[in-house]
């Protein structure tokens, strides 16, 4: 019985070693797009493993960009999420592909657009050529979206952009204060507007000390003190306690 147990244990150890070696072999190989896509669909490689693979070979970034255009959701969103992670840690590696991320803003998939908004904001930290400045209007045009998540994403990422490009703070502030005039739609209710206002106050708080239009901002925040949304009221109160 003891020998049987030892043999079974040895089998599972061997099986685990085989699986580990198989994964290592997958990660060590040079992908083409079809192999990358299939690996994500079949889950023979995790997103974390693939991320580490790309970190060791940034030449794989074009494959991820191709993957974002895939008709398969697992590939599309898997590659898109990896690009966000890379933009946070290695914006300089993605910066040469800035134009590709601008194109993704017009994706028919909202999640891809949201991810592109995040990536572009992260790339402003290394935007020596002021490529973002050229698309400022396009980026902030998404504040006019019919969808709350799209508007909220622009508001949230505006803080990253403002800190990376402080000379744009006056323009960014002007854009953020326009959320008061966001239109109600099927996908953006009055309560959604309150959520957006709450996020706007948080974002403005990241760089309020650098804002010239302080009284306009304070007026916007004070108007939120009577909101029926508790979290918005408390956010406004905390802002005014610090800055008002």
Give the positions of each predicted feature:
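Short inter-helical turns and helix N-cap capping residues of alpha-solenoid HEAT/ARM repeat scaffolds
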Residues: 71-73, 108-110, 146-147, 193, ...
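Amphipathic alpha-helical scaffolding segments comprising HEAT/armadillo-like alpha-solenoid repeats
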Residues: 28-34, 55-68, 91-104, 129-142, ...
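Conserved hydrophobic register position within alpha-solenoid helical repeats
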Residues: 50, 79, 116, 154, ...
């Amino acid at each position: 019985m003891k020998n049987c147990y030892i043999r079974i244990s040895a089998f599972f150890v061997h099986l685990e070693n085989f699986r580990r070696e198989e994964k290592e072999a997958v990660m060590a190989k040079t992908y083409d797009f079809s192999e990358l896509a299939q690996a994500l669909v079949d889950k023979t490689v995790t997103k974390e493993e693939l991320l580490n693979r790309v970190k060791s070979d940034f030449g794989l970034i074009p494959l991820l960009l191709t993957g974002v255009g895939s008709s398969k959701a697992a590939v599309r969103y898997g590659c898109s999420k990896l690009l966000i992670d890379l933009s946070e840690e290695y914006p300089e590696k993605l910066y040469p592909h800035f134009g590709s991320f601008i194109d993704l803003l017009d994706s028919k998939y909202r999640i891809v657009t949201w991810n592109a908004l995040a990536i572009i904001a992260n790339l402003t930290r290394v935007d020596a050529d002021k490529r973002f400045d050229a698309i400022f209007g396009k980026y902030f045009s998404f504040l006019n979206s019919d969808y709350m998540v799209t508007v909220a994403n622009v508001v949230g990422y505006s803080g990253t952009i403002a800190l990376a490009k402080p000379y744009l703070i006056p323009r960014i502030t002007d854009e953020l204060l326009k959320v008061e005039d966001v239109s109600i739609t099927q996908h953006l209710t009055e309560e959604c507007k309150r959520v957006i206002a709450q996020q706007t106050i948080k974002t403005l708080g990241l760089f309020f000390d650098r804002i010239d239009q302080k009284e306009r901002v304070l007026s916007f925040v004070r108007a939120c003190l009577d909101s029926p949304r508790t979290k918005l009221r408390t956010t406004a109160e905390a802002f005014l306690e610090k800055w008002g």
